């Protein structure tokens, strides 16, 4: 899919309401087009046990705490990637999306993570000093490398799947 195809508005685009956050049913028009192009393989990801249990709120407490610690560390790198993407586009829609996601990662998700982790007896010091797992480090190194060295389309391709996966989950309860 060419960059021009991603940014061009079509009659099938629906409005994006930033106040509702990024969800599978509330995506910016450019993201709707990218998501639709991936429909054939996308649903398989939601059937993976970890993602399914996370979404259902049935993930065992130890796994959930480990996930939250890793995700807490990840959010800072994810926000950096969006800042770099913001600097690489002139498109107001994409700029607003990058800024909204960056703000959400730093000011909303991190606060939720801190609250859950504190309820598990994990201190701020432990949260801030946790080492990323090898997998998490490989992933964040990859998206940061793309953000530093590639253009906005490559950055969007790198970050949108995470926004779609976690935006699509409704975590109603936590173990």
Please place each PLM-identified region on the residue numbering.
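Active-site-proximal alpha-helical scaffolds that flank and shape metal-associated catalytic sites
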Residues: 93-175
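Short hydrophobic/aromatic-rich motifs at helix boundaries and adjacent loops
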Residues: 21-24, 52-57, 84-87, 113, ...
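A ubiquitous short alpha-helical element
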Residues: 33-36, 63-70, 124-129, 155
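Short alpha-helical hairpin
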Residues: 9-18, 22, 35-60, 78
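Short, charged, low-complexity loops and linkers
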Residues: 21-30, 55-65, 120, 145-150
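Sequence termini and other peripheral, non-core segments
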Residues: 2-22, 135-142
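Alpha-helical bundle segments that constitute or directly flank the non-heme di-iron/ferroxidase center
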Residues: 39-44, 58-88, 108, 157-167
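Exposed alpha-helical structural elements
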Residues: 29-33, 40-41, 46-50, 63, ...
């Amino acid at each position: 899919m060419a960059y021009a195809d991603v940014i061009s508005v079509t009659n099938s685009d629906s409005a994006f309401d930033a106040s509702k956050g990024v969800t599978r049913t509330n995506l910016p028009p450019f993201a709707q087009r990218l998501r639709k192009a991936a429909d054939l393989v996308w649903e398989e990801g939601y059937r993976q046990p970890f993602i399914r249990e996370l979404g259902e709120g049935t993930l065992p407490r130890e796994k959930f705490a480990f996930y939250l610690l890793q995700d807490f560390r990840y959010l800072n790198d994810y926000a950096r990637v969006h800042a770099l993407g913001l600097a690489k586009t002139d498109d107001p829609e994409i700029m607003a999306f990058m800024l909204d996601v960056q703000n959400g990662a730093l000011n909303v998700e991190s606060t939720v993570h801190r609250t859950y982790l504190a309820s598990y007896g994990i201190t701020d010091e432990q949260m801030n000093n946790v080492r990323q797992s090898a997998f998490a480090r490989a992933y964040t190194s990859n998206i940061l490398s793309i953000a530093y060295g590639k253009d906005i389309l490559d950055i969007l391709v790198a970050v949108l799947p995470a926004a779609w996966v976690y935006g699509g989950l409704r975590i109603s309860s936590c173990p």
